[in-house]
């Protein structure tokens, strides 16, 4: 029973960590990265397609991305999707290829990005603490229903707190690395 509680806690918190990781992966660091365009959705063929489903994205150098659109008839829509993503990017079309020269980040932009990172991190921490609260309430009910003993309850409580602390440390560690990356490039 306790192993199930522990596994459930870890699984739910892992999903939160992965979501946080995906959020910060899309934040620019001053270096070209294909993941910068991961969240872009293109309106084509009467529906929505992720950019990586209609084009190949590659890094040419530290400041340049190349997007090879597989269907030349949708190059304009891909360009518009990039422009509408509010990433402060200026795509240039060259046939079926779109090149993006990444502008240097100003200090003001860097500070805004760091604020955004902190917001993502705080949202992830809140989600982790909410998961802890939910699991603790579940465990409390199990104790009240005599499904687990008092000792098991206290052991589970301690274990859940340790898992929570570990996951918050992971969030803070990833935040610190990404923050340094933004401020030092």
From Swiss-Prot:
The keyword Cell inner membrane does not apply. One of its GO terms (cellular component) is cytosol. One of its GO terms (molecular function) is ribosomal large subunit binding. Transmembrane segments: none annotated. Keywords: Cytoplasm, Protein biosynthesis. It comes from the Bacteria. The keyword Magnesium does not apply. SUPFAM superfamilies: Ribosome recycling factor, RRF (SSF55194). It is found in: Cytoplasm. Belongs to the RRF family. HAMAP family: RRF. This is Ribosome-recycling factor. It comes from Wolbachia pipientis wMel. The lineage of its organism: Bacteria, Pseudomonadati, Pseudomonadota, Alphaproteobacteria, Rickettsiales. The gene is frr.
